[in-house]
Amino acid sequence: MILILLGPPGIGKGTQASVLSDILKINHIATGDIFRKNFKENTELGILIKKIIAQGLLVPDDITNQMIADYLSKDIATKDFLLDGFPRNVLQARFLDDFFKNSHLFLTKVIYFNAGTQDLMKRIVGRRICPECGKVYHIENIPPKTPGICDKDQKTLIQREDDKPETFLKRLKVFNQETLPLVQYYREQNQLFEVDGMQNIDQVTKMILEVLETDRK
């Protein structure tokens, strides 16, 4: 089984990726983790990407594609995984199609988590994180027992720069320009399943598992 998760920033892809990978017993492959691994190990690609980022430039598709391909080639033995954070545009999707074809792999489903801008904004700006343990709260939906304080280690909660309204809107603009066209790309391939990402976690998971089970029949 191979799944791809798509959705705007703040929709909860990472949370669903963790839940689904545990239930389905498949690997959760997050692009951010692959980048950090290459940085930490000072690989040739990792060093190159660091230089590009240091110049304030975007990492070219061909370099990102190569990093993903290298990782998947080493981890291909299981042939069961979930991609979170890749592809980000149609060119990357076409590269991935070719990679799957050459590796005799078959994409099971693309899950697209949809939501309106205002709903996303409300979710994002209310998010708070513990700088010590990383636990995520929301001032309305998942509040700590004591306002502004982590339940676990009593540290003062913070709001990430990415979660501030002006930063979020910039990230959303990039998503709409680059990643949103992927929805139509995969819809035309009859591989897309769209789900309301603003439902609670259990509801979203249930809907995804149901459509995957239907596809198996």
From Swiss-Prot:
Keywords: ATP-binding, Cytoplasm, Kinase, Metal-binding, Nucleotide biosynthesis, Nucleotide-binding, Transferase, Zinc. It comes from the Bacteria. GO terms for cellular component: cytoplasm. InterPro entries: Adenyl_kin_sub, Adenylat/UMP-CMP_kin, Adenylat_kinase_CS, Adenylate_kinase_lid-dom, P-loop_NTPase. Its EC number is 2.7.4.3. Pathway: Purine metabolism; AMP biosynthesis via salvage pathway; AMP from ADP: step 1/1. Zn(2+) binds at C130, C133, C150, D153. AMP binds at T31, R36, L57, L58, V59, G85, F86, P87, R88, Q92, R160, R171. One of its GO terms (biological process) is AMP salvage. Residues 30-59 are annotated as: NMP. Belongs to the adenylate kinase family. Catalyzes the reversible transfer of the terminal phosphate group between ATP and AMP. Plays an important role in cellular energy homeostasis and in adenine nucleotide metabolism. Consists of three domains, a large central CORE domain and two small peripheral domains, NMPbind and LID, which undergo movements during catalysis. The LID domain closes over the site of phosphoryl transfer upon ATP binding. Assembling and dissambling the active center during each catalytic cycle provides an effective means to prevent ATP hydrolysis. Some bacteria have evolved a zinc-coordinating structure that stabilizes the LID domain. This is Adenylate kinase.
